[in-house]
Amino acid sequence: MFQKNSSDGYSSVLPGIELKTLVYGEKTLMTEFLLEKGRQLPKHSHPHEQTGYLVKGHIRLTIGAEMFDVMPGDSWCIPGDLEHSAEIVEDSVAIEVFSPVRADYLPE
């Protein structure tokens, strides 16, 4: 599968948090998140392993009991079923990959 860059395809996950599925295959799904300064991703978990890379901005990411100040170029891996949350310190862009594929993030 090949996906051309486009400004279309974003959907609101929460106020100030936009998601776009970039590409997906049989085992992984890649997303782009646009994150607005001052917003929170509440503590949650899911069965998917989640790896990410911060393209721009600044977020505070809590994975389990550990908190990380995430800056551009930093990356992370969150095992499936582990609680995590994020505070958006500056307007940010993050790329995240989920495995297995998250059916709720597939384009309609």
Please place each PLM-identified region on the residue numbering.
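Short acidic-glycine-tyrosine-enriched beta hairpin
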Residues: 65-80
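Conserved short histidine dyad/triad with adjacent acidic residue
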Residues: 31-45
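Ligand-binding loop in jelly-roll beta-barrel domains
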Residues: 80-104
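Structural motif
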Residues: 58-60, 67, 83, 92-93
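Glycine- and acidic-residue-biased ligand/ion/polar-headgroup-sensing regions
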Residues: 48-59, 64
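A short, N-terminal "cap"/entry segment at the start of jelly-roll beta-barrel domains
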Residues: 1-27, 107
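A cytosolic small-molecule/anion-sensing beta-strand core signal
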Residues: 55-56, 71-72, 90
